[in-house]
């Protein structure tokens, strides 16, 4: 008993309340009942035990949303609080411990009434008592702050209960409550009968389904290659207008050869006939060339099946290999006539088609049999190199830009150029072998030897070194093969590679300055931050990040202790110098060691560093010594001890260097023509198979389908040429690659690529899964018509589920876009705003070869986008983590210095172009003269003086 004669008792501050008595938004108009005093609770039935347990859990879950605080559940007149809440720990207040918080409850003389009731006087009096309790205020401030934060975060869901739930106050008011068929209270919003009927029908239809439909991402089993099968590649050379010449070639073959069946059966006789036809080309060019074209196409009139036809094609073209130079000379002569002459163009263009057909078939056979018959392949490669066929075709296509003619057959020339590049340089498998050999030649580790090992780029490692130096100035991190630090502040090359450490990030610079002075020997740690916001207004944002721009002056965890149990348990294998007084935290030292061991220096990076040093030497007016250039493959001789793979790799590099030197001035026109050819696909029309069921309608659409097919094949060849050149140029020298990438970018490739991707984005999935009509004509079908047995055995399977003919074109386009915009912020800014939507459409079909360029561009584009864009493209962002190899310290989503990247973007582009001009003029001065660059020895040749002469000044 206390002084007032009232007894005290301990009881829980919050008691469970029945769910039907709860009211929204904690504004109560009626009296509530506690759950333990409801009749159903006092006398529980067996069937309702589980329901009551669920209600108790639900009460606890709804406490925060419905403001079930202590103020809402104080007792009535006989239960008034006059005590103070004891000091509780943080865990107890958070509900992490099982202690029950209790207060003293004053009991009134009216103890006989067992029902708790809320009255307005009791609530007001209780609130007045709370104003005098300081401990209660502290708890309530914290609760209010938490509730305010939740309301700010969930503002859009503030009135969910008012929309979805029944007004619980109506129960206590005794008003009419809707009851469903089962006799239960219906808390749903009232609806009219028609709407309820439609809802019932939808529910019934859902119940009838055995399982809900689930949209799976369909996968396409396809791999990007520069050369697929011989059947596919040979058929892509022809169009419907070319088939009319087949009969003439067969007739001339029978006229030239007295025993055609023996030619088909006896290989020795066939070789002698081929030799006679080659020798007679100067006397009768047209007839001999058409007969050789029929031989190259496999003598299809004498074959009985497609497999036999393919076998004869391989045999006959290998017989033409020893005479390849004569065929190339005849082809060049005819091509020049089609380009320059004005007479007999119809005849000349037919001869150009047949001569180029022979070369195309020989190239395809050699690409396919590179591993099986290397001797014949090397003969063809050497013959093409001696005759400069690759350079001739490039300049031939360049001439078409200024003097376009139908007789030049530009579509066939583009396809032939693509096959020549693949043959002379190599396909994907040859590229991997060559890259491995070149890396070994320069003493570098090929990246694919350890694909599971994460690495870090030199630029990110340099940024990490600067961060460690800013925190621990006396600690010297290992350089790990990085170039020496030189003053580049006055050089234009400073914009090429800019490390961006966290200490110089604007977010870090905005952090507060450390509270203690940096000169303090051993300052105490800062006080713990206040978790409670006591002021009015919204809770301010607080950041507890460390300012990386200030040195760390606190003692290390392993400083001054000889016996460290952690180091004893971990085998570090670190040699410590006894006289070294610099001690840093163990985690920092371990991170420095891991990153230094994982540093990956690519061949392209070393090449860029070398040319950058030469560029800086020239800027300062120093003399250069270019006697032994490490990356000049033209002057590199074969070593007697070199392996076969290394010799082959050096030969490929020399062919690339020769091609680059000869065609440097032609790349601009080549890219222009190729992009113009690619843009022709923007006018294509597509027809679904379900719309073209009539055979007569299909025959009417066949000419249009042939045109669409020819445009798409030209798109594939044009994109393949650019992709192959970029790929091989980068392996030869990074600045060769950058020069071609600049030319492609300046030709507005980004707009062209985005337009083509947008054109095909809607039909892409259905096109891949063969839902659209394709032309029924093909090279093999046309050849089968010349032999009855062949025609009977030949069958076209048009019911295939997947048609991947168009996928290489998209893969090439995306890869070129990635190579042109990669690590170039200025070019990323030119990407259209809808590029993310296009990527999502091509992301619908699962295929890693299509995913990789999309995800790599997404990885570079994401930091520059806002939160809404990131949320809308979260599927692409997740794909980067799933399918792409990331670096050790790669915080690519939000860790970039956006303002710094954007401000330095233009400078990076200018510095790169200046370095490209220096590289080309330094190594390919003769080729640069065709572009207007050269030494000016006399002042009279100065550009300003020449302009003055033109103006008569």
From Swiss-Prot:
**Composition bias, kind Basic and acidic residues: at what positions?**
114-134
**Where are the annotated segments for Disordered?**
104-160
Origin: domain of life? Eukaryota
**Among its keywords, does the record have Cell cycle?**
yes
Q: Which InterPro entries match?
A: Far11/STRP (IPR040185), Far11/STRP_C (IPR021819), Far11/STRP_N (IPR012486)
What are the GO cellular component annotations? cytosol; endoplasmic reticulum; endoplasmic reticulum membrane; FAR/SIN/STRIPAK complex; Golgi trans cisterna
Record's keyword terms, sorted: Cell cycle, Phosphoprotein
Question: Which purpose does this protein serve, as stated in its record?
Answer: Participates in the control of the reentry into the cell cycle following pheromone treatment.
Describe its partners and assembly state.
Component of a complex at least composed of FAR3, FAR7, FAR8, FAR10, FAR11 and VPS64.
Q: What else is known?
A: Present with 1080 molecules/cell in log phase SD medium.
The name of this protein is Factor arrest protein 11
What taxonomic lineage is listed for the species of origin?
A: Eukaryota, Fungi, Dikarya, Ascomycota, Saccharomycotina
Task: Tell me the name of the encoding gene.
Answer: FAR11
